[in-house]
Each structure stands twice: as C-alpha cells, then as structure tokens.
Amino acid sequence: MAEVDWIHRHPKAEDLRVGLISWAGTYLTFEAYKSSVTASAKSLGRRQTWELLVSNEHESQAVIRLKSLQGLYLLCEADGTVCYGRPRTSHHGCFLLRFHRNGKWTLQCIISGRYLESDGEDVFCNSRVLSAYHMWTPRPALHVHVILYSPIYHSYARADHTVGRIWVDAAIPCLEECGFLLHFQDGCYHLETSTHHFLSRVDRLVPQRSSQTAFHMQVRPRGLVALCDGEGGTLYPQGSHLLLGMGSAPMKGEEWFVLQHFPTWVSLKSKSRRFLSVIYDAEVCAASERLTQMSLFQYECDSETPTLQLRSANGYYLAQRRHRAIIADGHPMESDTFFRVHWNCGKITLQSPNGRFLGIASDGLLMANVTIPGPNEELGIRFANRPFLVLRGRYGYVGSSSDHDLLKCNMDQPDCIQLLPCRQGIYHFQAQGGSFWSITSFGTFRPWGKFALNFCIELQGSSLLTVLAPNGFYLRADRSGTLLADSEEITKECIWEF
C-alpha cells in the first residue's frame, strides 16, 4: 500500500476560542450571577473565553457572533447596554469585526453601528466614533502547548536544537520538536521549544526569555495567526529549507500559520516488550525492539465515549479487516477503525468492533481474536512526543507561585512538569528546578521534594488525562486554587487538559 499524504485536520472548536483584552488590560467576561457582561477580570478563564462564529469574512474584516462557553451570545441592545442571551433576529448579536495593523480588533454592532468598548470594568456600545477605547486585543484561548501549520507549504514548524533554528518542513507533527509553548506576557508572545529555548528576533534559539523573544500576534478567525516584531518585520518560512525567520516581504499568505493544540502520539508495547509497528506498509506487528516513526500512533479519543482511533504515521488508521487481522489502512469515518479502550493501572486493552480483544498472534501480528482478555492482551502505553506535561484544569493551569509554597491549579502561566518514565503508564513528576513533586498528608503538593514518587497517568480523551497520585487518590482542581489529591472517583475537576 502506498503512503498517503498526511491530511492536516481542521482546527477543533476549542482551538478557535479567544479571550478579548480591553485597553485597560482586563478581559471581556461572562458574569452568570450578574446576568451581565463586564471587563474586570485580570486573567483568562472559562468565563473570559469566547467562541467566534463567522458568517462572512474578508481580508480585513468579518461578520461574527461571540458565543460564551455557557452557550449564550454577546448582545448589544438599542440603548447601548451589552448583555448575553439568545439572538432575537438574524442580525441581533452580529458584529463587524475589523482587524487592525497593530494586532487589535474592533467590534462594531451591525444594527446600531456603535463600537464595543469598556471603561475598564463595564462594557457598553455607545459611540460611533472610533477611538483607542474601542480596541480589543485577541488572545487565543487554546491550551498553550501548540503546533504551527503552514497552509501554504503544507508542513509544520520544527525546532532543530543542533543548529538552534526552527524550520517549517515537518510533514507529520509526531515528534516533540514540533510542539511549542506559547507564553503570553505583557501583550506579547514568547515561543518556547521542547528543550525550553526561545525563538528570538534574530531567527535563533536562545536560552532565556527577553524583549528579543517577544512577538506581537495577528489573530484571525478559523485559527490563523502571524507573529511580528511590531516594527514591520514578520516571521515566515524563507529559502529552500524553509527557515522560520524575520523578514518584511512575505509572499501572499506565507506569514500565516494555523495554530492548534499539540496532538498526542503514543507508543504501544506488547508483553514481550516489543513495540507495535506498521510493517510492509500496512500490517501491524509486535516485532521491533527499537522505537521508529512507524511505531508511533496518534491517539484520537472521544472524551464522551470510550472509543479510540489510532492513526499511523503512514496516514491511515488501524482497522479490523478480514480474518480478524488489524491493518493500518483505515479511513477516519470507518466504523472498523473505532476500538473500545479499557485501562488498567496505566496499561490498556483494546476491543475491536466485533467484540473481540486485540492480542499478539504467534507470528507477532496484531489480531482481534481473544474473547476474554488477560495479561497477554495488555499493552503498555507511553507518550512518544511529550517530555513534559502542562496541565490545565477547570480553574487554570497547574503551577507554582512565589506567594505560596503549595502547587496551585488556577495559574494564568503554567509550570512544565518533566516526565521521567518509570514503568508503562507510571511516571515521576519533576519540577523545573530538578526537584520532584512531593505530597503532604493533606493531599497537597510541593515542587521541591528530594525523592521521586510514582504517578499513574490514564488518557481520557485526545488531549485529556487523569492522574492517580501516590496516595491512591486522583489529582483534583479545587475551587480555592489549591491542587489536591483527594478524589476517589473521577469527576470533572479530575480531568486535565494537557
């Protein structure tokens, strides 16, 4: 079977959400208990996150609605007040969104012609004369661990630490070098690589964040972004090797990237400690003792149902075929590509659409031929493209603060949790300074332990997981902002985006 071109997936709804920052540095906020919209929040959370619904788009403007995560829309009334609810007419809640050269947005009510503005606390639509008070800075609300895809070159950005550069030449985003952390600070963005280096304005990777690593971001609906220096320079792929560098003359569209959440790639090991790999273009066999690109699988799982699709680096999905064989030749919507996943202490068993479990046959091939699973059908699973985790829960990111000695779960800026694999599904959590996570008798955590502890990770979706702590309880985001391990059951507060 010939390898297919890697098909770039369109951004998901969560990749297209934004926060809107007023001239005063505060966020447009959905206030459920006040039945109103304000701009008083200092950080980006669930109530400050808005989905853009685009009905018409041109180069410098678009007609949009803003929808909150609660399912209600931003509405401008005839008297200039701004509230939320459901549109009463086809134009109610529609805004003309204009993109300005400085990266700011303005939102003009389609019905009244008045601009959305804030006084730093309240939000209203009173004036038809444009001013600085009507400017809003868009901030992408997706998880900070991202990939950058060039729709012009059909390739992904990749950090090359051997030469300290970033190239836009990766056909498949399966390596950790394709992942970047997008830090937002003082209105600018810093692009951090998987080895914790930063892209600078002189096109090289440097070890420290500084003014030379700060970029302004142009944001468009549908997940498009461009990074620039604010002085006429823009980042875009250059030369025959597509070096990501600063320049002033990109060809039309070269500077735009699709910003998406970093996908999850895993490796799977049989009981004989051999990697599952795609061989002869399509057969899946547990034969390799060495990890190769054909041993990597993109983990695509619906968080609402325990069904899993595994996408091989050849562009196809694992599927059950004739004679119960598992072949990497499936397509996205085929029913034979959906497997039921069962977790057990960091390992998984996979159940095919015919109800049988996947196991390794005597010739090493992966087959769906077992009715009652046992240890031989368990597969060890490990992250293949993530040397660290960045966890985001219901109240913010997991991180440390100089004001608290305990790890918090409501931070705007995250800490990186270095992963030290111990056994399949079991990891040690290491803090940024090289110390380990330690747990107190109250189920709270400190980031300066001397000894490594075991944490069990189980995937709950394509980019969702739960963590079983050393005390036998699940990690939970508490409303107070303290990270706790005190939950016997998996609740919404135990689900972490990574």
Swiss-Prot record:
| UniProt keyword terms in alphabetical order | Actin-binding, Cytoplasm, Cytoskeleton
Tissue expression as described in the entry: Expressed in testis.
An annotated Gene Ontology molecular function? actin filament binding
A Pfam family that this protein carries is Fascin
Where, per UniProt, does this protein localize? Cytoplasm, Cytoskeleton
Matching entries from InterPro entries are given as: Actin-crosslinking, Fascin, Fascin-like_dom, Fascin_metazoans
Sorted alphabetically, the Gene Ontology BP terms of this entry are:
actin cytoskeleton organization; actin filament organization; spermatid development
Which GO cellular component does the record give, naming just one? cytoplasm
Q: Per its UniProt entry, which superkingdom is the organism in?
A: Eukaryota
Among PANTHER family, the record links this protein to: FASCIN, FASCIN-3
> What does the UniProt record say this protein does?
Acts as an actin bundling protein.
Q: Which family is annotated?
A: Belongs to the fascin family.
Please report the name of this protein according to its UniProt entry: Fascin-3
**Gene for this chain:** Fscn3
